[in-house]
A protein has these predicted regions:
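Metal-dependent nuclease catalytic cores that hydrolyze phosphodiester bonds in DNA/RNA
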Residues: 1-84
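Mg2+/Mn2+-dependent nuclease catalytic core
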Residues: 60-154
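Conserved pre-motif I regulatory segment
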Residues: 172-213
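A substrate-engagement module of RecA-like helicase motors
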Residues: 183, 235-344, 352, 432-439, ...
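Walker A/P-loop
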Residues: 205-227
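Signature of the SF2 helicase/ATPase Hel1-core->accessory helical subdomain module
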Residues: 224, 230, 250, 326-343, ...
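A contiguous, basic/glycine-rich beta-loop/short-helix subdomain that forms a polymer-engagement track
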Residues: 319-344, 355-361, 460-578, 586-587, ...
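Conserved RecA-like P-loop NTPase helicase motor core
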Residues: 575-586, 637-745
Length: 777
């Protein structure tokens, strides 16, 4: 829907009017996508075999309450002559066609078409039918619909829309006053913070993309949040804040609370993922399958979002408490409530993931500001969104699942036979394989095979669903595989571009789609927003991040040095050791000796950052066996929030602790080691990704397009993790400590030149320098 306030004109589709009678418009989950796809095929088949006019275009003006509603739509099929007209709307169904319930939205669509032909084409002899099609069993059912006068209903619907518009216009005038309540919450600005606020304020007002590169201590969270919030409220827009980790969301929540404490008037909500907040085992978010979903949309005059909106900060606890009280879907409640919020805080997935991103907000992105926190993390995350795989072992598991399922033997045989075709197809891809250094091979894929396979599997899936003696569970293996296969097939259609590669893992028969760069996909999504702010302490080199994040050349680049006193920090390089993959084991004893010598100079807590869990696991037993007097803490591969919090508590309340952690992990960014939680950090190596088949493909791609393959694939991603890890030691003006970069590569110009210039790195005797540093502080 669009409207012009000056001309008092509303642009509406027939579908929008019809669906206003039915609020169940949840996100498009798996079975809905399946039904939509099969439904489209049924539409096309029926229309192609009809003698009527297909996709018949209609438009008319409906005047009411001083407004004009311009209504447009397309009827599926229209049969007309001089005296009569017959209208048909097609609806596919996966249910028993003889007992299918009539769809109120499609009946309303038909009535609107009847209304048009009577009042605007002058027909009196009008008939209409709903055509139900069961594409699996090739059945049809025609249901005649009696044309009724809908003038009063149409008046009521459009008056409701006008009321919404007028409330929105009133809200705009109120928001201009409300924006005056948004006050900077602190007595003083951090160094450079006021300058950042002024620059971001100008940029959001001018719809300019901002790259904010600022180290810890400047207060970049508030520096971007405050001016963006003030702007979006004054302009009746919305602010999306997206992060890669929940720890970063906690930081934003604290900033939101501080703004609210100072009297700022706004509404904010944090979206918890559906997987975390869902309370049932029902597979589909559909009114027919999930009791919580069904009840949510069947509550008369649903006022639950309004109850939540009495709060200024709406979090998971408040959403779960209200949804539990009413036994309704907490995720749908959160999304509906978010529609009325000024700030929506969520994970990257809900903005950038092609399958998960918000659907109901898509039309409003162009009226929104987006803050991307720790934007350096978006590069790998986005590439993973567009990478997918399917293996013969995975398919075999599905065949075994089908074998032991409760469906009839005929359907079991059909599904199993079809899946074996896919196993055979993937196995035959080995014919393209040559002897290579890696156990992988780039191969050519028959996209048409997968497209046809998917269509057949969709039909078999509906047979499977209809034959089950119980309700589907969202953990159902066939359903999960179906969703997986759909997306895999969809991505295959994009692999004709250089950004993608199709790879066969020879030993495992794993067929993969590798996205080498998602920059073009990011460009598409970022361009949907009115203004975007990408921020991090590591957005240099600028050219690298502009390229990898899909940003235009005319972005506003804001870059600042550390605001902390230089005397409080000491940066050193130990170039006497090697941390290369081939040599690092030989230098473990040297690394441990230096660590022990350094930490004996001052009692405190220390961080050791590794390039990978692999090296951490190798190093840890040696450190324990060295009779070190400190307590050793260690990051695990699958660490829970609770375990992470426990380690942070030990560092906060104790001394003589050593934390072993991985660069790029949960302890290397998005966490503050304030005060004496961390007195120093040892960075072991430049954090380069491990050489692999995939990384080498990326390297070749970057070399072709940017002439800098090694830097883009290895060096810059590694140094980003190094700088993030080093930043954990210094979180305030009073924090004091050191960072030792361990490895000879740090002393070479190709690495040294990309470390922050304000590090003032020293190469002299490390023990002497640290001793002097502690004695002067």
């Amino acid at each position: 829907m669009r409207y012009n306030e000056k001309d008092k004109l509303i642009e509406l589709s027939v579908r929008e009017i019809a669906f206003s009678l039915d609020k169940t418009y949840g996100e498009k989950y798996i079975s809905r996508r399946l039904r939509a796809k099969i439904g489209q095929e049924a539409h096309t088949y029926y229309q192609n075999n009809s003698e009527g006019h297909t996709e018949y275009y209609i438009q008319f003006i409906h005047e009411i309450s001083g407004w004009k509603a311009h209504i447009r739509g397309r009827a599926d099929i229209v049969h007309k002559n001089e005296n009569s007209v017959h209208i048909e709307e097609i609806k596919s169904t996966v249910s028993d066609i003889e007992n299918v319930s009539q769809d109120i939205t499609q009946i309303m669509q038909l009535q609107l078409y009847c209304h048009y032909f009577h009042f605007y084409e002058g027909y009196n002899n009008i008939t209409a039918s709903l055509i139900y099609i069961d594409p699996v069993n090739n059945k049809e059912k025609h249901v005649d619909i009696t044309p009724n006068s809908i003038s009063n209903i149409l008046d009521e619907i459009i008056n409701g829309i006008i009321s919404q518009i007028e409330n929105e216009l009133l809200k705009k005038s109120v928001n201009k006053k409300r924006s005056n309540t948004i006050k900077f919450p602190y007595k003083k600005y951090h160094k450079y913070q006021k300058e950042i606020i002024e620059n971001i304020s100008k940029n959001v007002e001018s719809s300019i993309i901002t790259m904010l590169n600022a180290p810890p201590g400047i207060g970049k969270t508030m520096a971007s949040l405050y001016p963006s919030l003030k702007f979006i409220i004054s302009q009746n827009k919305r602010l999306f804040i997206t992060t890669s980790k929940t720890t970063q969301q906690e930081i934003y929540l604290e900033s939101v609370k501080n703004l609210l404490k100072k009297g700022s008037k706004f509404k904010s909500i944090r979206i918890t993922s559906k997987q975390k907040i869902c309370k049932t085992d029902t597979y589909d978010c559909d009114e027919n399958d999930c009791p919580l979903f069904e009840k949510y949309f069947n509550i008369e005059n649903n006022s639950l979002p309004e109850q939540l909106l009495k709060l200024d900060l709406i979090d998971r606890n408040s959403i779960e408490e209200l949804s539990n009280d009413h036994s309704i879907c907490p995720f749908e409640l959160s999304l509906d409530t978010a529609l009325e919020c000024d700030i929506i805080l969520s994970d990257y997935n809900y903005i950038f993931h092609p399958r998960i991103k918000f659907q109901r907000f898509l039309d409003t992105f162009n009226n929104s500001v987006l803050i991307i926190d720790e934007a350096h993390n978006l590069i790998d995350r986005a590439s993973s969104y567009y990478s997918e795989s399917i293996s013969t072992s995975q398919i075999t598991e599905i065949i075994n699942f089908v074998k032991h399922s409760s469906i009839n033997e005929e359907i079991k045989l059909k599904i199993s036979t079809h899946l074996k075709r896919l196993i055979n197809h993937i196995s035959r891809l080995k014919d393209q394989v040559r002897d290579l250094e890696f156990d992988n091979e780039i191969i050519n894929i028959d996209i048409q095979f997968f497209d046809n396979f998917q269509k057949t599997f969709d039909n078999l899936l509906i047979e499977y669903i209809n034959d089950l003696p119980f309700k589907l569970n969202k953990k159902d293996a066939i359903i999960k595989f179906s969703d997986h296969l759909k997306f895999f097939t969809l991505l295959l259609k994009e692999t004709n571009t250089d950004e993608f590669e199709t790879v066969l893992d020879i030993q495992t028969n794993n067929l993969r789609i590798l996205c080498k760069s998602a920059s073009k996909k990011l460009t598409e999504q970022i361009n949907k927003f009115d203004s975007v702010i990408l921020q991090s302490a590591t957005l240099t080199p600028t050219e690298y991040y502009q390229s990898m994040l899909g940003l235009p050349k005319n972005v506003s680049i804001l870059s600042y040095p550390s605001p902390f006193p230089p005397k409080n920090s000491l940066y050193l390089i130990d170039n006497s050791i090697s941390t290369t993959y081939k040599e690092r084991k030989m230098f473990i004893s040297n690394i441990i000796k230096l660590i022990k010598d350094v930490i004996e100079l001052k009692q405190g807590n220390y961080l050791i950052f590794f390039p990978s869990f692999e090296f951490l696991d190798i190093f840890k037993p040696h450190l324990i066996g060295s009779s070190i007097s400190f307590n050793i803490l260690s990051q695990d591969r699958n660490m829970t929030d609770k375990s992470r919090a426990k380690i942070l508590s030990k560092l906060k309340n104790n001394t003589s602790q050593i934390l072993l952690a991985v660069m790029g992990g949960v302890f290397s960014e998005g966490v503050d080691f304030k005060g004496d939680m961390a007195n120093g950090a040892f960075i072991i190596g430049p954090g380069l990704p491990k050489i692999s088949f995939d990384q080498e493909l990326k390297k070749s791609y970057f070399e072709k397009y940017y002439g800098n393959g090694f830097d883009y694939a290895y060096k810059f991603p590694g140094l980003t993790k190094v700088i993030q890890s080093a930043g954990r030691v210094f979180r305030s003006n009073t924090d004091r400590g050191f960072v030792i970069f361990m490895g000879h590569r740090f002393s070479t110009d190709s690495y040294l030149n990309y470390l922050p210039t304000d590090y003032d790195i020293k190469f002299k005797n490390i023990i002497t320098e640290i001793n002097r540093f502690w004695s002067h502080n």
